[in-house]
C-alpha cells in the first residue's frame, strides 16, 4: 500500500470514528451544519487526548441526571485555589466568571469593570490556575490515601477535587476565528463547558448593566457553531452554553435576520427627519451637551416609536374596519415568524392601507437599531439557539420565578429536552426580591422547571470581600485576638483543612517525593522535626 493510500485509509477510518462518536446519545439534540469529513480534514496527524474531555463527559452526566430528576447543580464563581479546594467538598461544579476575572485576574493585571476589554487569555488563564490546583490536590490526596493502611483509610479525606469547570467566554472576543481560538484555549486549559452571550463584542456589558447591544440571531448561532466545530476538531465533548441578553437589551447591530424583526423599533411619524441627520445638523450649528440631549429628547417624544406589530394594531383600531378584533387576530396569526417585508404586505391586505413604519429613522449615532427586549424576545432567541447549545441561559433583571417559568415553558414548548441555566446573581437585592424561606427553595423550584445548572456569578468575590473587611476591621482594633476568634478557632471547630496550611499546600506530598528519590531519607524535609504545624496535632 502506498503512502497516499495509507493516508487515505487513516483519514476514512477517522471519519468513521467521528460519525460513530456523533451517534452517541450525548449528541441526540445537537445540530451540526458541517460534516465529519470537514472536521477530520482540519485535524493534525498527532491525536491529542485532552483531560478536559473527561471533565466535559462528567459534567454532561451530572446535567443529564439533574434534568431527568428535575434537580439542579448549583455553584458559584471561584477566585483561587484555596476556594476551589473548599468548594469541592460540597459542590459538584465550579464556575469561572469573566466579571471576577476582569476585576481581579486580568492577564495585564489592569482591573476593569465587566466590559470584556481584557485580553482573551484572561479567563482561560484563570481556568488553568484552578485546573492545575484541582489536579495537584487530587494527587496529594491520593498519595495520602494510598500510603494509609486499609483499616485506617476511612479516616482520610476522600474529596472529589476534579469538579468540572464552566467558564465565561463573554462574546467570543472577536469574529468567528477568535471564538474558535478562545474555545481551543479553554479546552487546553481544563474547561468542561463555556458560555457565550449574544451581545456585540465591542459594546459588551455585564448582564446587569444598561446599554446592551445585541447581534442578530444568525450571528450568535455562528458563534455556537464555531465552538462546536473547534471542540469537534479537538475531539472533545465540551459543553456550549448559549446566553441571551435580549430580555433587557435596547439596541441591535443589524436587521439582517428576519427572526429579529418583530422586536425592532421604528418611527411611525412620517413628518420628522431621521434622528442622526438632525443631530449632525445641530452639532454643525455649534450645539453640544445638554442642548443636544434636549433635541434628541424632543425627537423621541414626537417619533411615535413602537414595534411594527403595535403600529399595525393601532392602525386597525383607528380604522373604519367593522370587526377590529378579528382583523388584529388575523394579522398577528398570519404575520407570526414573518419578515418585516412580509408583515407589511399582510398588514396592507388586512388594513387596506400601507402602515408607515421606519426603523432607520431612530438609529443611534453609532448606527444601532432600537430594540425592545423582554421575556418573549428571549424565548424567540432561545428557540433558535437550542439546536446548537447544550444549555440556554436568559440573563434577567430580577430573580422572578414567574418569569423563569414563562421562559422555561416557552422554550420547552418547542424543545422539551432543552436544559437551562440560571444566574443567581448578586446584582439582585435578594432581601427585597423574596423572603428567606423562598430564597431557600428557589434553586429547587427552578430545578423542577429544567434549570439544571445554576450559579452565583460573583459569590467568590463577595465572600472574600466580606471576610476581608470583617477581619481587617477587627484586627485593627483587637490585634491577634481577632485572628484567633474570627479565623483560626472557627477553622479548627469546622475542620477546615487549611488550618494546617503546610499540609494543605502539599508539603507532606513533596517530602515523600523527595524521599522516594533519595532512597527514603531527606535531611531537608519540610515537615520534619521542628515544623510548627505540630502544634495543631491533638
UniProtKB/Swiss-Prot annotation:
Subunit structure, as described in the record: Homotetramer.
Role according to the record: Catalyzes the formation of succinate and glyoxylate from isocitrate, a key step of the glyoxylate cycle, which operates as an anaplerotic route for replenishing the tricarboxylic acid cycle. Required for growth on ethanol or acetate, but dispensable when fermentable carbon sources are available. Also acts on 2-methylisocitrate.
Listed transmembrane segments: none
Name of the protein this chain belongs to: Isocitrate lyase
Catalysis: reaction(s): D-threo-isocitrate = glyoxylate + succinate; (2S,3R)-3-hydroxybutane-1,2,3-tricarboxylate = pyruvate + succinate
Entry's Gene Ontology cellular component terms: glyoxysome; peroxisomal matrix; peroxisome
Gene: acuD
Active site: 206
Coiled-coil segments on the chain, per record: none
Pfam family, one: ICL
Amino acid at each position: 500500500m502506498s503512502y497516499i493510500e495509507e493516508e487515505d485509509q487513516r483519514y476514512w477510518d477517522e471519519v468513521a470514528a467521528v460519525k460513530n462518536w456523533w451517534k452517541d446519545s450525548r449528541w441526540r439534540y445537537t445540530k451540526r451544519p458541517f460534516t465529519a469529513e470537514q472536521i477530520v480534514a482540519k485535524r493534525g496527524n498527532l491525536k491529542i487526548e485532552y483531560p478536559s474531555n473527561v471533565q466535559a463527559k462528567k459534567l454532561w452526566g451530572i446535567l443529564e441526571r439533574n434534568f431527568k430528576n428535575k434537580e439542579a447543580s448549583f455553584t458559584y464563581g471561584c477566585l483561587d485555589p484555596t476556594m476551589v479546594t473548599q468548594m469541592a467538598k460540597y459542590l459538584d461544579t465550579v464556575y469561572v466568571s469573566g466579571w471576577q476575572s476582569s476585576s481581579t485576574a486580568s492577564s495585564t493585571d489592569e482591573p476593569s469593570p465587566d466590559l470584556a476589554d481584557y485580553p482573551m487569555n484572561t479567563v482561560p488563564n484563570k481556568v488553568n490556575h484552578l485546573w492545575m490546583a484541582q489536579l495537584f490536590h487530587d494527587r496529594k490526596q491520593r498519595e495520602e490515601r494510598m500510603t494509609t493502611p486499609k483499616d485506617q483509610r476511612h479516616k482520610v479525606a476522600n474529596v472529589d477535587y476534579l469538579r468540572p469547570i464552566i467558564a465565561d467566554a463573554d462574546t467570543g472576543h472577536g469574529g468567528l476565528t477568535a471564538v474558535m481560538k478562545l474555545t481551543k484555549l479553554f479546552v487546553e486549559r481544563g474547561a468542561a463547558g463555556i458560555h457565550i452571550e449574544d451581545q456585540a463584542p465591542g459594546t459588551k456589558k455585564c448582564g446587569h448593566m444598561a446599554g446592551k447591544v445585541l447581534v442578530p440571531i444568525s450571528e450568535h448561532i455562528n458563534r455556537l457553531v464555531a465552538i462546536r466545530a473547534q471542540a469537534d476538531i479537538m475531539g472533545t465533548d465540551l459543553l456550549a452554553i448559549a446566553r441571551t441578553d435580549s430580555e433587557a437589551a435596547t439596541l441591535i447591530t443589524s436587521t439582517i435576520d428576519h427572526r429579529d424583526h418583530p422586536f425592532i423599533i421604528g418611527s411611525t411619524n412620517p413628518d420628522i427627519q431621521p434622528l442622526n441627520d438632525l443631530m449632525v445638523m445641530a452639532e454643525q450649528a455649534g450645539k453640544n451637551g445638554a442642548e443636544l440631549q434636549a433635541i434628541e429628547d424632543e425627537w423621541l417624544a414626537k417619533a411615535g416609536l413602537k414595534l411594527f406589530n403595535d403600529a399595525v394594531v393601532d392602525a386597525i383600531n383607528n380604522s373604519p374596519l367593522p370587526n377590529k378584533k378579528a382583523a388584529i387576530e388575523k394579522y398577528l396569526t398570519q404575520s407570526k415568524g414573518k419578515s418585516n417585508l412580509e408583515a407589511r404586505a399582510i398588514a396592507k391586505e388586512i388594513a387596506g392601507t400601507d402602515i408607515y413604519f421606519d426603523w432607520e429613522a431612530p438609529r443611534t449615532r453609532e448606527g444601532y437599531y432600537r430594540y425592545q427586549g423582554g421575556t418573549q424576545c428571549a424565548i424567540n432567541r432561545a428557540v433558535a439557539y437550542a439546536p446548537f447549545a447544550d444549555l440556554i441561559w436568559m440573563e434577567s433583571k430580577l430573580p422572578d420565578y414567574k418569569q423563569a417559568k414563562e421562559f422555561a415553558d416557552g422554550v420547552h414548548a418547542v424543545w422539551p429536552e432543552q436544559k437551562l441555566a440560571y444566574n443567581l446573581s448578586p446584582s439582585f437585592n435578594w432581601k427585597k426580591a423574596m423572603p428567606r424561606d423562598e430564597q431557600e427553595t428557589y434553586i429547587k423550584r427552578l430545578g423542577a422547571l429544567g434549570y439544571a445548572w445554576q450559579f452565583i456569578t460573583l459569590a467568590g468575590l463577595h465572600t472574600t470581600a466580606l471576610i476581608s473587611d470583617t477581619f481587617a476591621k477587627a484586627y485593627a482594633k483587637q490585634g491577634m485576638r481577632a485572628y484567633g476568634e474570627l479565623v483560626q478557632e472557627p477553622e479548627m471547630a469546622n475542620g477546615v483543612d487549611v488550618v494546617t496550611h503546610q499540609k494543605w499546600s502539599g508539603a507532606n506530598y513533596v517530602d515523600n517525593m523527595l524521599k522516594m528519590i533519595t532512597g527514603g531519607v531527606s535531611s531537608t524535609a519540610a515537615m520534619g522535626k521542628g515544623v510548627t504545624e505540630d502544634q495543631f496535632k491533638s
